[in-house]
Amino acid sequence: ALPISAGQIPIRFRDWDVDALSVSGHKFGTPKGLGALLVRGRTPIEPVLSGGGQERGLRSGTQNVAGAVALAIGLNESNARMQAQYRELVASRDMLIDAVRRVVPRADLTGDPVRRLPGHASFVFPGVTGEALLVDLDARGIAASSGSACAIGRHEIPATLLAMGLEPSVAKSALRMTFRRPLAREQIERVSLALEESYAGLTRR
């Protein structure tokens, strides 16, 4: 199944050449553990849970009605917010990317420069590890990530970057910044200043 950042980009399941698509509610503000799987037509799928035959025999067990309602409400609200703020988020992302490149010219943006999530900026910083940069930025009041959420705390090299062809020595210097609301110019300046000072300090050691 193709995992999608629902509520951040328009979902066009009918137009996409995929058999299945999954969404995780915590990505758009619902309680953790809620999600949905969209399966195209007659795509064969094996159930993980068996028993009572609920949900067309694909997921047996008592249905979480409250969770399903929360997922639907969260997705509706997130989609409405996305439509209202999409352009602002893209502008904030691009301003942040430009600011980071300005203060740390050696930083390389990972992924496609245009076809990316509106509130997402990921870089590699030669000469430092993402973990060291993350810790230093945290001390300066800046929250970021050095890998995917499912690998946090394990100090692993981001598998996505390795799959994109980056060398392990480069991939381990990754830092990811995400946001769900448009950033003010002052916020971007604060992040870029902290990053400039942090990177300079770490590369001098």
Descriptions of predicted regions:
Residues 3-205:
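Pyridoxal 5′-phosphate
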